[in-house]
A protein has these predicted regions:
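Catalytic activation segment of kinase domains across protein kinase-like and atypical kinase folds
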Residues: 256-336
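Conserved structural core of kinase catalytic domains
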Residues: 161-233
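Helical subdomain adjoining the active site within ATP-dependent kinase catalytic cores
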Residues: 11-49, 320, 329-430
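ATP-binding glycine-rich phosphate-binding loop
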Residues: 56-114
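Compositionally biased low-complexity segments enriched in polar/charged residues
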Residues: 1-13, 54, 58, 62, ...
Length: 430
């Protein structure tokens, strides 16, 4: 059940500025950055992204520092006061395995029309010996913040729009969120489990708060389930290009980057306007040390990858979860494998619990199915059984070998599925 949990006043001048910005539809990166600056205003919450610095090295944690409060200036703040400063209402959306999502809603001066949204992710800190103190930068809750900060510079530098931009983060007391269930403002089984675990002393008394952009189209899995019957070949091609291109951009800078949980419900969807003319985007990608251009249709949505609490870049963003003994069994480790995320997305997409109708669905073009089979051949899509001696894949779809069967750059350069997006025989459009 979704219920509004807070209602705050907001300065009329700020509302008018937001309305003016909303008319730009947030399709462009500059508009997204302007929104973050406007939302933060002059409150005490620091921006996670320094928009005046445009290099990833600026935020790489290459020192021996382990305290997130010093590396990112993550403060302890009063949640209610901070949200009051930002303004608007909060609406509970859902609970996942590791976090709980709220939607921030800012209304117009009359309080009737919704003009802007932001996302709030609330994450409890499990008490585990190998995770350390709540301020340890290697904890998965803090590693996610570090990863978002590093990757955000690919967006700031206009190399890709396909990453959720973080806004701010802080620690706060867990008690206001415990009270939500008590007051029946939130009614959800996973949220109830969160309350139960806290009462059993499995969580610290603080929670981590992440404020970020809001994606207005839900997640990609729901989008596909709701729209697959009317999706054309160009729609599938564009979606897959967006996903593969953002992995390519990241891996070209950080070949050791691994998301480790890149499934369709960890990819968010932003609805964007369809233009009447020139309804294409020009992607300028550096592949094999040269620039290649791709003309990508605007299909009315833009994906953004999200949920980085399992992610790592060895030597830059370390993650205690990735370094755990149990993750070795599912081949999640701080070792370069540019195929891992690619495989996990496409393999899980067609599995039970996701979109198993994919292979038998007559509405899906045969070229789309062939492309997925090119990325995940049958020997790497087989689900293990007790009698299966060739165990390449876990029963949840994770590949168990570290061979880079293929990788994003190779696919964009060579796979004929994307030939229509290559505008000319030349490498780049001047």
């Amino acid at each position: 059940m979704n219920k509004q949990v807070k209602n705050n006043d907001i300065d009329n001048n700020k509302i008018n500025a937001i309305i003016e910005l909303k008319n730009k539809k947030f399709d462009g990166i500059n508009d997204r950055i302007e929104f973050i600056k406007l939302l933060l205003g002059d409150n005490n919450l620091n921006s996670m992204v320094d928009f005046d610095m445009c290099d990833t090295e600026h935020v790489e944690n290459r020192t021996n520092g382990f305290d997130i409060r010093k590396i990112m200036e993550k403060k302890y703040m009063d949640f209610n006061k901070l949200i009051c400063d930002i303004g608007g209402k909060l609406l509970y959306i859902k609970s996942g395995t590791t976090g709980h999502t709220f939607k921030g809603i800012i209304y117009d001066n009359d309080g009737t029309s919704e003009i802007l949204n932001y996302a709030i992710k609330v994450v409890a800190y499990p008490i585990r010996e190998n995770y350390g103190d709540v301020n340890d930068v290697k904890r998965p809750e803090n590693a996610e913040l570090m990863m978002l900060r590093v990757l955000s510079y690919f967006v700031v530098n206009a190399q890709t729009p396909h990453i959720v931009l973080p806004i701010g983060t802080f620690n706060t007391s867990i008690k206001p969120f415990i009270a939500l269930a008590k007051n029946k403002i939130v009614e959800n089984k996973k949220y109830d489990q969160f309350i139960k675990r806290y009462k059993q002393s499995e969580y610290h008394d603080d929670v981590s708060i992440l404020i970020s952009e809001w994606a207005n189209g839900g997640d990609l899995l729901d989008y596909i389930k709701n729209n697959y019957k009317k999706m054309k070949l160009r729609d599938w091609r564009t979606l897959f290009f967006q996903i593969i291109s953002v992995l390519c951009v990241i891996q070209n800078k950080y070949p050791g980057f691994r998301h480790n949980d890149l499934k369709a419900n960890n990819i968010l969807v932003q609805n964007i306007d369809l233009r009447k003319k020139n309804n294409y985007y020009l992607y300028k990608l550096h592949l094999a040390n040269e620039r290649y251009d791709f003309l990508v249709p605007n299909i009315g949505i833009q994906i953004k990858i999200w949920d980085f609490d399992f992610a790592c870049i060895p030597g830059i963003v370390e993650n205690s979860k990735v370094n755990s003994d149990w993750t070795d069994k599912i081949n999640v480790k701080p070792v370069q494998n540019r195929y891992y995320d690619l495989h996990y997305f496409f393999n899980t997409l067609t599995m039970k619990g996701f979109f198993p109708e994919f292979w038998d669905c007559k509405e899906i073009h045969h070229q789309v199915k062939q492309f997925v089979r090119d990325i995940v051949p049958e020997q790497y899509s087989k689900v293990n059984t007790d009698s299966n001696e060739n165990q390449f894949v876990t029963n949840r779809g994770r590949i168990l070998i570290n061979t880079e069967y293929t990788y994003p750059e190779k696919i964009l350069l060579e796979n004929p599925f994307f030939n229509k997006m290559r505008p000319t025989a030349a490498k780049a459009i001047d």
